[in-house]
Regions:
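Residues that flank catalytic or metal-binding motifs in active/ligand-binding sites
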Residues: 38, 73, 94
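Extended boundary segments
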Residues: 1-47, 119-120
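Glycine- and charge-enriched low-complexity intrinsically disordered segments
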Residues: 102-122
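Short, compositionally biased
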Residues: 84-107
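Short, basic/aromatic beta-hairpin or loop at an interaction surface
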Residues: 43-58
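Short alpha-helix capping/helix-loop boundary micro-motifs
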Residues: 60-67
């Protein structure tokens, strides 16, 4: 299945170090198996990581058993659309890359909100 970004173009790689995405292929790809809808490519901040941890999703602690180094400020990561939206509503949403964000994010988050947080709009 072809994956497209919010501009109806081929989705760009979000990050390969650390490797991200539901399928750990570097892209914010999704399908029916991805219940969390990991489609928003964000540049994480310490504030967001602390917020996510407070909500029960610790993304900063290394988990060697899953080959996960833990995220640090400045890393790019495919976030769950609902988690990003929750962070936005609470004032902790990180900036995002629209060319790397899956169009499926629009089923959860308004495009104008996403554009306000874009790092790659000219």
């Amino acid at each position: 299945m072809k994956q497209i970004n919010i501009f109806d173009e081929a989705i760009e790689e979000c990050c390969s170090n650390p490797i991200t995405g539901f399928y750990r292929d570097g892209f914010c790809r999704t399908d029916e198996l991805d219940r969390g809808l990991h489609v928003v490519c964000a540049k994480v901040t310490d504030e967001f990581l602390n917020f996510s941890k407070s909500r029960g999703n610790d993304l900063s602690t290394p988990r060697p058993e899953f080959n996960f180094p833990g995220l640090k400020e400045g890393d790019s990561w495919c976030l769950c659309a609902e988690r990003w939206k929750e962070a936005y509503e609470c004032g902790f949403a990180p900036k995002i890359y629209l060319n790397r964000t899956n169009k499926k994010a629009l089923s959860v988050i308004d495009i104008d909100i996403l554009k306000d947080f874009a790092l790659d709009l000219i």
